[in-house]
Amino acid sequence: MLLIREIMHCKPGKVRPMVDKFLAMSKLNEKAGFGKMRVMTDFCGERYWTIVAEFEVASMQAFEAMMQGEGITPKMTKEFEKVMDGYHDLVEWGRREVYKIEG
């Protein structure tokens, strides 16, 4: 089992719109059978305006299939695209972390 973390450092004043996008994405992920996504904002940390979204996958192959949209309908693909439309305008930079869950 793997833990995937999407870490986004938003532009000032753009955290809430990005949180809304991740919360909508979480609902779509559940609807698609991908599981629940946890969405967190920084209380204090390395940088201000940070959002972390994390979820679990069985394997890298499962993650790759999820990222390629395998198993979802064209209608759901459009919903995912609509939710994430314009997110580049909200983010300065980001990164992905992948951890193996040991226990």
Feature-to-residue mapping (PLM):
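Active-site-flanking beta-strand signature of metal-NTP-handling nucleotidyl enzymes
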Residues: 3-8
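Short, surface-exposed ligand-recognition loops at beta-strand->loop->(often short) alpha-helix junctions
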Residues: 9-20
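A short beta-turn/loop motif at secondary-structure boundaries
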Residues: 41-47, 87
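Residue-level preference for beta-strand/loop junctions
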Residues: 2, 47-49
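Absolute protein N-terminus
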Residues: 1-2, 103
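Short hydrophobic/aromatic beta-strand micro-patches
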Residues: 9, 54-56
